[in-house]
Design a protein with these regions (language model features):
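Extended amphipathic alpha-helical scaffold segments
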Residues: 33-37, 58-65, 106-117, 135-139
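Intrinsically disordered or highly flexible coil/loop and linker segments, enriched in small
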Residues: 31-32, 67-71, 92-99, 119-122, ...
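Charged low-complexity stretches with an acidic bias
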Residues: 67-95, 174-186
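A charged, amphipathic interaction segment
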Residues: 76-136
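Charged, amphipathic alpha-helical oligomerization/scaffolding segments
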Residues: 21, 28, 53-56, 60, ...
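Residue-level recognition of alpha-helical structural elements
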Residues: 8-11, 50, 54, 75, ...
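Glycine-rich, aromatic-bearing surface loops/beta-hairpins
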Residues: 114-186
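N-terminal interaction modules that seed assembly of large macromolecular complexes
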Residues: 3-73
Length: 186
């Protein structure tokens, strides 16, 4: 809960990845709050007030996931909305703002994103969704202590740089400080 709040304020990409992980964690404990309390919350060594607050937070997520029908798969509506904002910002930086440095970073990441697209389930996916799914997949592999190939690690580096840059622009957008570059390319 505290980590989620910190990420939400400082790095929206890390926030989404963290919350996707929390969703998977809740699923792995079959939506049982007592299992979450015993296996997750108890590891934080919190005072009783903070523990109660964290239990309430997890219980709220369990209830939302159930209400939204995403017990087996999918993401919370709030996270889907954030993903839409991130995708919209990405598109704006590429076409409206024509942010040259961002365009260069995206160009370096595109071969990795295209490679991930070719390995996906055949559904048409937007670049940001593919990038986030790739980062999340590597995160899960690392959490499960599975080996991540050097090739995958290199691919993820370029995607990580792109998404970190996008997260910085997102913060600027939310703070109202994102502005058009002085020279537009169109």
């Amino acid at each position: 809960m505290y980590i989620a709040l910190k990420y939400k304020e400082s790095n929206i990409v890390e926030y989404v990845l963290y919350m996707w992980h929390i969703e998977e964690l809740i699923r792995s404990f079959n939506f049982e709050i007592n299992e979450v309390r015993e296996n997750v919350i108890s590891k934080f060594n919190l005072n009783s007030e903070a523990e109660t607050e964290m239990v309430r937070w997890y219980k709220g997520l369990i209830d939302k996931m159930t209400e939204e029908g995403i017990r087996d798969a999918g993401h919370l509506t709030e996270l889907a909305e954030v993903m839409t904002e991130i995708q919209y910002l990405h598109h704006s930086l590429m076409t409206v703002y024509q942010e040259k440095s961002y365009q260069d970073i995206v160009a370096k990441a595109m071969p990795s994103i295209d490679a991930l697209k070719s390995k996906s389930d055949g559904r048409q996916r937007i670049d940001i969704e593919v990038a986030m799914n790739g980062l999340f997949g590597v995160l899960l592999l690392k959490l499960k202590k599975r080996q991540v190939t050097e090739e995958t690690q290199e691919a993820v580096k370029t995607i990580s740089v792109m998404m970190a840059t996008l997260a910085k622009h997102y913060n600027s957008m939310k703070q109202g400080t994102l502005s058009f570059p002085k020279v537009m390319e169109n």
